[in-house]
C-alpha cells in the first residue's frame, strides 16, 4: 500500500477505536460485518484450513489462494457485481491473496487495557498527563488498589464515611455481609473505579488547554521563587520545573495531532495480518509458528474467560473478575512488550517469547533490517581499511566491486568507442578482464562519485560522497580523518557503497555530500574531521621518542656499540653507532632512515635555524664543552648551542627523533599549502 500511494514517510502513533474498526471491518452482502477475531484457533487439524473467526480466518483476512474462496469456488471472469465479490456460502472475498499482508483484524477487549508503551515508557506519558506517580498508576492498573469515582454530587457511601465514623464503627457487624450480596456489584460499579478503566476515565476528563495554562502558571511561580539556599529544595524545584515543561509539551502535541489522551487505553486490540506472523509446515509434521500467534492466543483465551465471567457477574465473585482483568492486562502487555513486567515471558521450552516490540526494535528489527537495511541495485559492501595515500575526498574501491557497479557504463563506452559490436561481446571482455576494460573503467570512475554509508545512519554524516579510485585487494580504502563522522574504526567495520545514477543525485553528491565539504558537525559546529583512534596511536608512536633523556648516551652501558662503527657521510653529516648522530638537514636524516641506519625513535641532533626563543631562554645548560680553538658547546636538555671564541652563536642543534621530523614536515607542508591557497583567494 505504501508503493501504491507513494508515501514518503512512516509514523507510529495513537489511533481511535473507530479507526481500528475501519481497518478491519468488511460488510458482506447479507449485512453481516466481519473483522473481529473471537477464537484462538488457527488451522483445523484435519483439513489444514483456517478456522472461522480465528487468527487466520479467510473471511477476515482474505483468501489463501488468489480468487478462490474457502469452498474452493472461484469468481466468474468479468463479474463486477458487488454481490459476487464475496462467496455466498462461506463469505470469503474473491481477491488477491496478497491482501493477507495488509488486511487487519481486531479483538474486542472485555475490559479496557492500558498500552504498556505509554504507561511504562521513560518518560511515562500517562503519568505525565495525570501528574501522578507511576507506582500508584501501576497499582491501579493491576488491581492493587482502587479509588472513589466522583460520579455524582449527591452524598455517597464513601463520601459520608468521614462524617459518620462512630456510626459506621458500631455497624461493622451489619456492613460486612453487604460485600457478599449482589447489591455490592451495583455499588462497586457506581462508586469504585479500578484497573485500566479508571485510568481511561481520568484521561477522558482531562482538558488539555487547562493543563497547559495551569502548568505555565505553576512554572512561573517556581521561577519567581528563585533559590532558597537549601540544596535539596532547590533540586526538587528544578525537577518539578522540568516536569512541567515536559507536561506542557506533551499536552500541546496531543492538541496539534488531534489525538485524544484516552486512546492510550485500549478497548480494541489490532490483529496483525497473517502473512506478517506466518505458520510454516515442515517435513515430519513439524510446525514452525511466530511467537506473536501464541501471544495472541493467550490474549483471546483470557479475554473470552473474562467475557464469560462478566455475563455471569451475579454468580462470579468480584475478586475473581478483578483477577481475570489483571490476567488480560498482563497478556496484552506481553504481546506488546515481553519484558515490560521485569522477566520476559517464556514458553514450555524456556524460550523467551518475541513480542511486537522485539520484532520492531533493534538491529534485526523490521525497520532497520527489512525496510532500511534491504539490498538495492547498484550497491556493494565490504570491510574498510586505512588508505594512507588517499586524499580526504577519495576512497579506494576493489576491482571486483568497481567493475560490478560501473558495468553498464563500461559496456556503453566499449560500444561507443567501437571496441565491441554488441553487449554480449562487451560482457565477455569484462569477464576476461582485458586491459581496455580497466582503462575505460578508470575514465568512467573519474567523473562519477560514489556514496559510502555505515549503519546505523544516525545523522547526515553517516553517508558521504567520495571520488573512487581503484585499489588492489577486496577491501574499501578510506581516509582515517572521515571516520569520526561515520563513527567507524578499522577493527572489521563494514560499509556499503552506492552509485548515484541520475544527474540530480550526482549533483547533490558533489555539492552537498562530498567529505571535504562536511568538516564541521551539523549539530554543534565543532570540527568533525579530527584524528581519532588509529591516527592518534600512530602519531603517538611516531613522536614517542626516547624516554631515557639526554644522559642515556653517556651512562647507557647496554645501548652503546663501542666496537662497531658505521659511518654515514653526506654533506658533512656524520653518523656513528657509539654516539647520537648529527645531521645538518632533515633530508640527511631521512636518507639515513631509508638506509636503515636509524629508526623512527632513535635520538639524533639536527641543525636548526637560529631561534631567539631558545637563545633567550633562562635554562641552565647541563654541560659546557670547550675546544682548543676557543669554540664551545652548551648542551641543554633538548638543544645544543655552538659558539665561537667571540661568544657569538654559530649554530643550534635540536635533540629530536626522525618521527618528530616527519610529523613537523607534514604540518609545515600543510600550513604552506593553506597559506598559498588563502593568498590566491585574496
UniProtKB/Swiss-Prot annotation:
Cellular component aspect of the GO annotation: chloroplast; DNA-directed RNA polymerase complex; mitochondrion
EC number: 2.7.7.6
GO MF: DNA binding; DNA-directed RNA polymerase activity; magnesium ion binding; zinc ion binding
Cofactor(s) in the UniProt record: Mg(2+); Zn(2+)
Residues involved in Zn(2+) binding: 69, 71, 87, 90
GO biological process: DNA-templated transcription
Gene3D superfamilies on file: 1.10.40.90, 2.40.40.20, RNA polymerase II, clamp domain (4.10.860.120), RNA polymerase Rpb1, domain 3 (1.10.274.100)
InterPro entries: DNA-dir_RpoC_beta_prime, RNA_pol_asu, RNA_pol_N, RNA_pol_Rpb1_1, RNA_pol_Rpb1_3_sf, RNA_pol_Rpb1_clamp_domain, RNApol_RpoC1
Pfam families: RNA_pol_Rpb1_1, RNA_pol_Rpb1_2
Residues annotated as binding Mg(2+): 489, 491, 493
Subcellular location field: Plastid, Chloroplast
Keyword Magnesium in annotation: yes
Family assignment from sequence similarity: Belongs to the RNA polymerase beta' chain family. RpoC1 subfamily.
HAMAP family: RNApol_bact_RpoC1
Subunit structure: In plastids the minimal PEP RNA polymerase catalytic core is composed of four subunits: alpha, beta, beta', and beta''. When a (nuclear-encoded) sigma factor is associated with the core the holoenzyme is formed, which can initiate transcription.
Protein name per the record: DNA-directed RNA polymerase subunit beta'
Amino acid at each position: 500500500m505504501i508503493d501504491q500511494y507513494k508515501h514518503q514517510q512512516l509514523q507510529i502513533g495513537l489511533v481511535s477505536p473507530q479507526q481500528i474498526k475501519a481497518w478491519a471491518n468488511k460488510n458482506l452482502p447479507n449485512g453481516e460485518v466481519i473483522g473481529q477475531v473471537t477464537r484462538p484457533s488457527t488451522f483445523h487439524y484435519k483439513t489444514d484450513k483456517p478456522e472461522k473467526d480465528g487468527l487466520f480466518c479467510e473471511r477476515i483476512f482474505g483468501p489463501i489462494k488468489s480468487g478462490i474462496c474457502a469452498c474452493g469456488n472461484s469468481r466468474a471472469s468479468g463479474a463486477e457485481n458487488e454481490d459476487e465479490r464475496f462467496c455466498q456460502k462461506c463469505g470469503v472475498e474473491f481477491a488477491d491473496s496478497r491482501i493477507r499482508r495488509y488486511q487487519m483484524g481486531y479483538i474486542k477487549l472485555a475490559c479496557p487495557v492500558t498500552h504498556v508503551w505509554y504507561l511504562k515508557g521513560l518518560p511515562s506519558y500517562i503519568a505525565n498527563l495525570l501528574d501522578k506517580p507511576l507506582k500508584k498508576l501501576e497499582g491501579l492498573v493491576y488491581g492493587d488498589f482502587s479509588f472513589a469515582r466522583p460520579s455524582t454530587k449527591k452524598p455517597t457511601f464513601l463520601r459520608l464515611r468521614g462524617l459518620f465514623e462512630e456510626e459506621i464503627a458500631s455497624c461493622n457487624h451489619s456492613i460486612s455481609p453487604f460485600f457478599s450480596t449482589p447489591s455490592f456489584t451495583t455499588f462497586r460499579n457506581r462508586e469504585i473505579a479500578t484497573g485500566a478503566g479508571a485510568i481511561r476515565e481520568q484521561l477522558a476528563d482531562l482538558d488539555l488547554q487547562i493543563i497547559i495554562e495551569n502548568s505555565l502558571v505553576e512554572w512561573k511561580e517556581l521561577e519567581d521563587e528563585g533559590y532558597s539556599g537549601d540544596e535539596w529544595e532547590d533540586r526538587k524545584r528544578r525537577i518539578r520545573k522540568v516536569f512541567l515543561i515536559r507536561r506542557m509539551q506533551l499536552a500541546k502535541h496531543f492538541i496539534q495531532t488531534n489525538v485524544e489522551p484516552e486512546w492510550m487505553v485500549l478497548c480494541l486490540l489490532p490483529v496483525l495480518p497473517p502473512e506478517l506472523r506466518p505458520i510454516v509446515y515442515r517435513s515430519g509434521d513439524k510446525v514452525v509458528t511466530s511467537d506473536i500467534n501464541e501471544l495472541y492466543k493467550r490474549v483471546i483465551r483470557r479475554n473470552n474467560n473474562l467475557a464469560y465471567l462478566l455475563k455471569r457477574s451475579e454468580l462470579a465473585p468480584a475478586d475473581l473478575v478483578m483477577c481475570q482483568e489483571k490476567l488480560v492486562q498482563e497478556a496484552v502487555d506481553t504481546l506488546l512488550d515481553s519484558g515490560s513486567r521485569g522477566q520476559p515471558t517464556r514458553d514450555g521450552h524456556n524460550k523467551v517469547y518475541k513480542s511486537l516490540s522485539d520484532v520492531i526494535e533493534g538491529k534485526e528489527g523490521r525497520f532497520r533490517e527489512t525496510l532500511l537495511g534491504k539490498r538495492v541495485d547498484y550497491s556493494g559492501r565490504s570491510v574498510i581499511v586505512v588508505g594512507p595515500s588517499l586524499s580526504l575526498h577519495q576512497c579506494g574501491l576493489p576491482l571486483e566491486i568497481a567493475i560490478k557497479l560501473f558495468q553498464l557504463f563500461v559496456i556503453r563506452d566499449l560500444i561507443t568507442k567501437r571496441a565491441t559490436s554488441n553487449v554480449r561481446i562487451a560482457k565477455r571482455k569484462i569477464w576476461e578482464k582485458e586491459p581496455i576494460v580497466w582503462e575505460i573503467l578508470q575514465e568512467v570512475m573519474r567523473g562519477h562519485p560514489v556514496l559510502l554509508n555505515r549503519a546505523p545512519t544516525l545523522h547526515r554524516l553517516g553517508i558521504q560522497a567520495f571520488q573512487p579510485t581503484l585499489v588492489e585487494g577486496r577491501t574499501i580504502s578510506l581516509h582515517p580523518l572521515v571516520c569520526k563522522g561515520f563513527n567507524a574504526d578499522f577493527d572489521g567495520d563494514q560499509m556499503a557503497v552506492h552509485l548515484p545514477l541520475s544527474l540530480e543525485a550526482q549533483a547533490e553528491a558533489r555539492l552537498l555530500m562530498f567529505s571535504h565539504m562536511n568538516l564541521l558537525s551539523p549539530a554543534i559546529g565543532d570540527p568533525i574531521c579530527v584524528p581519532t583512534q588509529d591516527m592518534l596511536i600512530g602519531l603517538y608512536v611516531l613522536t614517542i621518542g626516547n624516554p631515557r633523556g639526554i644522559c642515556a648516551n653517556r651512562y647507557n652501558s647496554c645501548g652503546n656499540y663501542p666496537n662497531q662503527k658505521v659511518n654515514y657521510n653526506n654533506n658533512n653529516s656524520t653518523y656513528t653507532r657509539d654516539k647520537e648522530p648529527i645531521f645538518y638537514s632533515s633530508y640527511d636524516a631521512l636518507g639515513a632512515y631509508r638506509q636503515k641506519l636509524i629508526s623512527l625513535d632513535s635520538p639524533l641532533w639536527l641543525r636548526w635555524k637560529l631561534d631567539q626563543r631558545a637563545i633567550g631562554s633562562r635554562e641552565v645548560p647541563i654541560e659546557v664543552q670547550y675546544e682548543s680553538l676557543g669554540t664551545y658547546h652548551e648542551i641543554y636538555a633538548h638543544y645544543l648551542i655552538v659558539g665561537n671564541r667571540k661568544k657569538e652563536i654559530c649554530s643550534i642543534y635540536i635533540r629530536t627523533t626522525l618521527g618528530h621530523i616527519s610529523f613537523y614536515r607534514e604540518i609545515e607542508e600543510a600550513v604552506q599549502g593553506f597559506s598559498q591557497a588563502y593568498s590566491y583567494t585574496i
